[in-house]
A protein has these predicted regions:
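Metalloprotease/metallohydrolase-associated module, dominated by Zn2+-dependent proteases
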Residues: 3-68, 91-203
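Conserved glycine-rich acetyl-CoA-binding loop
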Residues: 71
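An amphipathic alpha-helix signature
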Residues: 74-75, 107
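Active-site recognition of the HExxH zinc-binding catalytic motif
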Residues: 75-88
Length: 203
């Protein structure tokens, strides 16, 4: 996959996620893939790009982070889309020069999308996010789980970090009641209803 193809994939994902989780309300942005060593992604609060008289905000996805499972990358994209939503709707979502994410703005809007869950970090506030089951299911419906956006793929290099499962999503099933959950990493999990350890479903 060329970097232009990776960018095009993220642009198409932006449109699909906007329609699914934001009601199609978000204006277009420019998607970039650039080095971002200290962050998974970044959103510019001003019009960083111009075409004629039209200005566009930018969402950057860190090039170093593209070897993560697709649900985590999409979670990052949604995170930055929440910043975009807050900006265009005049919702104060951060403080401390944009580093601290607050609960009344960012957390409320982010979890209101139904796409990501928000955790708390005392240094940066309600910034850490993770994909919900709804987002993971949507990714599977779109057929995105097998997409490889890693630098090795973009540069045409062999191999990678070997995460073990190509789509990054694992399904755990209770052997008794057959209740299931999805996770983006290996976990030890049990069914409280049956008191049984849930088993990894092999694909």
């Amino acid at each position: 996959m060329q970097i232009s193809e990776a960018t095009a994939f993220l642009e198409n994902a932006y449109v699909a996620l906007n329609n699914k989780f934001f009601g199609g309300e978000l204006p277009p942005v420019i998607i970039t893939i650039q080095s971002s060593p200290r962050a998974y992604g970044h959103y510019t609060t001003w019009d960083a790009w111009h075409e004629g008289e039209e200005g566009y905000r930018e969402i950057n996805i860190g090039a170093e982070t593209l070897d993560r499972p697709v649900p985590e990358i999409m979670g990052t994209l949604v995170h930055e889309m929440v910043h975009h939503y807050c900006a265009v709707n005049n919702i104060k979502d951060t403080s401390r020069n944009g580093t601290y994410h607050n609960s009344k703005g960012f957390k409320r809007v982010a979890e209101g999308t139904g796409a990501i869950l928000v955790d708390y970090d005392p240094r940066i506030g309600y910034s850490p996010t993770r994909p919900t089951d709804a987002l993971i299911a949507f990714i599977e419906e779109q057929g995105w789980t097998g997409v490889n956006l890693s630098r090795q793929s973009i540069l045409g290099l062999p191999g990678g970090k070997g995460r073990g499962r190509s789509n990054g999503v694992r399904k755990y099933v209770c052997p008794n009641c057959h209740c299931s959950v999805r996770a983006t990493k290996a976990v030890n999990i049990g069914c409280l209803d049956c008191g049984t350890v849930m088993e990894l479903e092999e694909k």
